[in-house]
């Protein structure tokens, strides 16, 4: 069940859907929707007529989308679930119990081989992994990542990315200590561990005190990629809504293809560039260029309005020359969103603008042109994620 762009009601068509859009509706008791469409280039869609409503007790926007299926870990039930759109709902296909596990990041190792990394549910201090066969929905293996536990004054940790290359598994992490009853802050250092795969023995650990909080939860937003040369890039995220160390800069870092160590000679300091703010989201355009989504600290008051105030800008960053170029897009709202899809020389960018409406904008990487594509209308407040099916 899906909608070709431009239709107003849920309908069937011989044109297969290519994209998925996750929408948060309006109001205090907002509904959430999943829409599928064959095109992001033009037309209008209304989630209440062209999409399916989501059962918020079972699922939220923290999704892994692949080959028409939606995968979600439910921390309330300790279940990893596989869904598909059938009839007029998002229907569970199968479930796996993963007791005591809390998902932080994932990496596809093969078509049906999905690696989950996360933390123990009781202390958030022990790094763990689960390797799944999602075709059969079975656990192939699971265990611990042998990286150091937090030490005083730190109580917990976060895993910001996971990346496998040949016989190595890389993960970035940082440590946290609580501030009051419901907040935390982060160490002034981030770490990158190279582990043997699949044995998980530690081969090397880098530490870097120039920034902190490497990556983020990639079921919510992208923060890392591999380029054509096999070099791996990731963004540190010390802003108030992630690492909560705004005194440290947001930066792009690199692990070269022929190395198991952090490239200490590469540190693209975005906070010291024209951007001069903290970043939330990183997507690869190709040809050594990437899109960065950045906050505007002069436009929001604090964490309380960080998500609701339109203040996010988009920049194209040249990873080699380290030059940045601001895209002429309306200010976006929503702290963390999976809002960019790159297809060939085009980038589709979902922007929720209070002035110009909710559009998928199309950026031509060859010419620099920006045009409006698909518009989301009706009960649309935020486009929280866009995915290739």
Which residues does each PLM region occupy?
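Short, solvent-exposed loop/turn segments at conserved positions within beta-propeller repeat blades
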Residues: 16, 27-32, 75-78, 121-127, ...
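Short beta-strand elements that form the blades of beta-propeller/WD-repeat-like
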Residues: 16-28, 65-75, 111-123, 167-176, ...
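Post-signal peptide N-terminal segment of secreted/secretory-pathway proteins
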Residues: 34-138
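Beta-propeller blade signature
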Residues: 35-40, 126-138, 184-200, 247-260, ...
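Beta-propeller fold detector
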Residues: 44-56, 90-101, 138-153, 201-210, ...
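Repeated scaffold domains used in trafficking and secretory/extracellular systems
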Residues: 54-67, 98-111, 150-162, 214-224, ...
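Acidic, serine/threonine- and glycine-rich low-complexity intrinsically disordered segments
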Residues: 163-298
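Intrinsically disordered, low-complexity segments enriched in Gly and acidic/Ser/Thr residues
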Residues: 260-356
